[in-house]
Amino acid sequence: MNVERTQELLVNMGPQHPSTHGVLRLMIKLDGEQVTWCEPDIGYLHRCFEKLAEQKTYPQVIPFTDRTDYLAAMLNELCYVEAVEKLFGDAIQVPERAQYIRVMLAELQRITSHLLALGSMAMDLGATTPFLYCWRDREKLYSLFERITGGRMLYNYLRIGGVRNDLPEGILGTPQDGEDKADKTIWGFINYFDSYVYPEWKALVTGNRIFQYRTKNIGVLTAEQAIAYSCSGAVLRGSGVKWDLRKNLPYAIYDRFEFDIPVGQNGDSFDRWWVRQEEMYQSSRIVKQCLEWLAENPGPVMAPKMPRVLKPPKGEVYHRIEGARGEVACYVVSDGSTNPYKVKWRSPAFTHLQLMPLLCPGHKIADIIAILGSIDVVLGEVDR
């Protein structure tokens, strides 16, 4: 029997599909197993964050930022509080110790976020063991975050003018701390990460031939396309563009630290994976430098003479940082009252999700999982 024509099949992946990592719906047209068209459908997790911010005081907005990208809450807090501090200008001087604590916790948060991104992507491609290792190692970091902030994922720890409280006694540890103290001291975790976690991921997954076969030359994004689509973070650097806000436009005190920017070559799913893996090691380097400074420099963690009621002068500010998924930015408008007139949030995951119609056609339906995992979207951040 001769088949003269085939009929395309329209498939809905989600919004409850386990590989979409949230309530994301992908509408896919298939010719056999080959994808001819892909369209993301979002909005299932919209919670009116930007409108709610207009009805809250400036400090009351901080917990809402935690709930955008709930896997990297500390980075969201950092973006918002630094934006508001810009509105005040020289009236608020953040103590140096608070600045180091902010950077250290931001980089530890980057490690937790990347661990989950790598672990979940590996599991979606059939590798269960790395995902379990990911949860094992993140649990150690969450124990540290809980001791410092009282929360495991949602912290409400950073403050306009500093941080809520100083670090608990003994949490820093010593450079001699080993694996047995990985969940008790920050030095213990960093030494454990450098000695076990980082080499383990490289050997178990990155060097695995099956994993490479599933990710190399899959979802290739050129540098020109990445720039045209306003990509950032690991997605942009995976395409060979050496751009990291911590280096190129330093904020906080990142200009004081020594670290490198990992850059991919081919712009495929494997390169985006590799960049995140190497970024974890660079974050470890930054944390070590913070630990050395904090051990020798006690001091206040909140700006002196902070007003009881925060009323920044009229004005507007746009502030951006290097988040776990790319460039997180916050546009804040002040009318001189206790509440922001407007808060606009830039989500890198929202921007990167627009790549799906570009990257998916021409690949097999199984490759969509690798492409989506390499983009690393969090639906709380996409929908806000």
From Swiss-Prot:
GO CC term (a single one): plasma membrane
Catalysed transformations (reactions): a quinone + NADH + 5 H(+)(in) = a quinol + NAD(+) + 4 H(+)(out)
Chain's role: NDH-1 shuttles electrons from NADH, via FMN and iron-sulfur (Fe-S) centers, to quinones in the respiratory chain. The immediate electron acceptor for the enzyme in this species is believed to be a menaquinone. Couples the redox reaction to proton translocation (for every two electrons transferred, four hydrogen ions are translocated across the cytoplasmic membrane), and thus conserves the redox energy in a proton gradient.
Bilayer topology: Peripheral membrane protein
Subcellular location: Cell membrane
Gene3D superfamilies referenced in this protein's UniProt entry, alphabetically: Cytochrome-c3 Hydrogenase, chain B
UniProt keyword terms in alphabetical order: Cell membrane, Membrane, NAD, Quinone, Translocase, Transport
Annotated EC: 7.1.1.-
Subunit structure and binding partners: NDH-1 is composed of 14 different subunits. Subunits NuoB, C, D, E, F, and G constitute the peripheral sector of the complex.
One Pfam family it belongs to: Complex1_49kDa
Record family assignment: Belongs to the complex I 49 kDa subunit family.
Name recorded for this polypeptide: NADH-quinone oxidoreductase subunit D 2
EC category: translocase
Keyword Transport carried by entry: yes
HAMAP family found in the cross-reference section: NDH1_NuoD
Molecular function terms, GO-annotated: NAD binding; NADH:ubiquinone reductase (non-electrogenic) activity; quinone binding
